UniProtKB/Swiss-Prot annotation:
Pathway: Amino-acid biosynthesis; L-leucine biosynthesis; L-leucine from 3-methyl-2-oxobutanoate: step 2/4. Keywords: 4Fe-4S, Amino-acid biosynthesis, Branched-chain amino acid biosynthesis, Iron, Iron-sulfur, Leucine biosynthesis, Lyase, Metal-binding. The gene is leuC. The keyword Transport does not apply. GO terms for molecular function: 3-isopropylmalate dehydratase activity; 4 iron, 4 sulfur cluster binding; metal ion binding. SUPFAM superfamilies: Aconitase iron-sulfur domain. InterPro entries: 3-IsopropMal_deHydase_lsu, Acnase/IPM_dHydase_lsu_aba_1/3, Acoase/IPM_deHydtase_lsu_aba, Aconitase_4Fe-4S_BS, Aconitase_4Fe-4S_dom, IPM_dehydratase_rel_enz, IPMI_cat. Pfam families: Aconitase. Catalyzes the isomerization between 2-isopropylmalate and 3-isopropylmalate, via the formation of 2-isopropylmaleate. This is 3-isopropylmalate dehydratase large subunit. It comes from Bacillus cereus (strain AH820). It catalyses: (2R,3S)-3-isopropylmalate = (2S)-2-isopropylmalate. Its cofactor is [4Fe-4S] cluster.
């Protein structure tokens, strides 16, 4: 019987197996940020240990930093965590993309753009959306703080091998429908626990048509379905993306030959298989308090089915059967490790070019990294957004989570390109609606949700 992509990635990294069936995996890349690392570094100090492989470790500042005035850090805990990361990286000789550094940005944005993320690697980070890197054919997953310490000290991690889920995507997406809509559809149909105990492998003709940044969006939110990770077999698009980046292998051709072996064999069998035809898929909007509570833009909100629905409707200030078009939007956030890359900003800019943000709506665009910011500004995207009434910010996690100054006021609704809509995720009492960059941009113009498929934009920005 053939092997799945998961099998090939896993087997290449097993150091040993213990009596309980746990495998000790070698970790090829450890990404670090300021929130989940302080206790881990302190653990090294208390036990007089060093970081085993600083050269396989890379840190950045992203969660806590302000995006309006990056140096004006007024929150005491945030400043303490940022200062500690700077001190820890200096002491343990870990490379750091500090505030203001040209490589700084959201950890799951800078990994791929710097070429740190590569096919065949095992990648971990103290952040649940580490699955993003699986778009490159890497086995990438989030870990807890105690595990962060273990990897820092040993460059290994004890893990139980998950099962493999194959998610086949067939058909061609309509104009105005994106990878974000695919994953929101998957979650709305199968729920937030469908992937528990599995690694999701996305494959099929639809994947072949997707660019790398769309694939990253898919894998980024695999965790929202309960999966350990999301992976996609590397192909020519993957190799072209990695080639020439700062940390890409110098002996690139040798690595590329090995990467060509990373695919699921034709006779391999998944433990669970799901097939989705995306041809008639529509833009999605979440209405509730987890990512599975979503509907097509052309559907009405569902009826209450259980106490969770009742609580969600109450928290969100919505009613069953309400039209998605009637959901008010006071805030728009285009950013996060899900949708803050250059192509995301280009799509949003193509929607708002020459138009104005609705009076009373606050709209933010937060590039995922300094490099994304600079590339967007070279193309004049910041002028398009600012002329439309958006705020153009510095890189960071920003309004994705309520850990920095960018928050949504209590009781107000935000169209967000992020990945989670839990109660209080964007601030106390904030009401979050997950959408694609195109849908978020359109909501900023109208002050409510609209069907982006009916808007007169071409999905690609013209710089004339």
């Amino acid at each position: 019987m053939g092997k799945r992509l998961l099998d090939k990635l896993w087997e290449r990294h097993v150091v040993t197996t213990n009596e309980n069936g746990l495998d000790l995996l070698y970790i090829d890349l450890h990404l670090v940020h300021e929130v989940t690392s302080p206790q881990a570094f302190e653990g090294l100090r208390l036990t007089n240990r060093t970081v085993r492989r600083p050269d396989l470790t890379f840190a950045t500042m992203d969660h806590n930093i302000p995006t309006k005035d990056v140096w004006n850090i007024t929150d005491r805990i945030a400043k303490q965590q940022l200062d500690m990361l700077r001190e820890n990286c200096k002491q343990f000789q870990v490379p750091l993309a500090d505030i203001g550094d040209e490589e700084q940005g959201i950890v799951h944005v800078i990994g791929p753009e710097l070429g740190l993320t590569q096919p065949g690697k095992t990648i971990v980070c103290g952040d649940s959306h580490t699955a993003t890197h699986g778009a490159f054919g890497a086995l990438a997953f989030g870990i807890g703080t105690s595990e962060v310490e273990h990897v820092l000290a040993t460059q290994t991690l004890w893990q139980r091998k998950p099962k493999a889920m194959g998610i086949e995507l067939k058909g061609k997406l309509q104009k105005g429908v994106y990878a974000k809509d695919i994953i929101l559809h998957l979650l709305s149909k199968y729920g937030v626990a469908v992937g528990t105990g599995y690694v999701m492998e996305f494959y099929g003709e639809t994947i072949g048509t997707m660019e790398m940044e769309e694939r990253m969006t898919l894998c980024n939110m695999a965790i929202e379905g309960g999966a350990k990770a999301g992976i996609i077999a590397p192909d020519e698009k993957t190799f072209a993306y990695v080639k020439g980046r700062k940390y890409a292998p110098r002996d690139y051709e040798t690595f590329e030959k090995k990467w060509f072996e990373l695919y699921t064999d034709a006779d391999a069998i998944y433990d669970l298989h799901i097939s989705i035809d995306v041809t008639d898929l529509a833009p999605y909007v979440t209405w509730g308090t987890n990512p599975s509570m979503g509907v097509r833009i052309d559907e009405k909100l569902p009826e209450k089915h259980d106490v969770n629905d009742e609580r969600a409707f109450s928290y969100m200030g919505l009613i069953p059967g309400q039209s998605t078009y009637d959901i008010p939007v006071q805030h728009v956030f285009i950013g996060s490790c899900t949708n803050s890359r250059l192509s995301d900003l280009e799509i949003a800019a193509s929607v708002v070019k020459g138009r104005k943000v609705k009076e009373g709506v606050r709209a933010l665009v937060v590039p995922g990294s300094k490099r994304v910011r600079d590339a967007a500004m070279q193309k004049g995207l910041h002028h398009i957004f600012e002329e439309a009434g958006f705020e153009w910010r510095e890189p960071g996690c920003s309004m994705c989570l309520g850990m920095n100054p960018d928050q949504v006021p209590e009781g107000e609704h935000c169209a967000s390109t992020s990945n989670r809509n839990f109660e209080g995720r964007q601030g106390k009492g904030a009401r979050t609606h997950l959408v694609s960059p195109a849908m978020a941009a359109a909501a900023a113009l109208y002050g409510h949700f609209v069907d982006i498929r009916k808007e007169s934009y071409d999905g690609a920005i013209s710089y004339s």
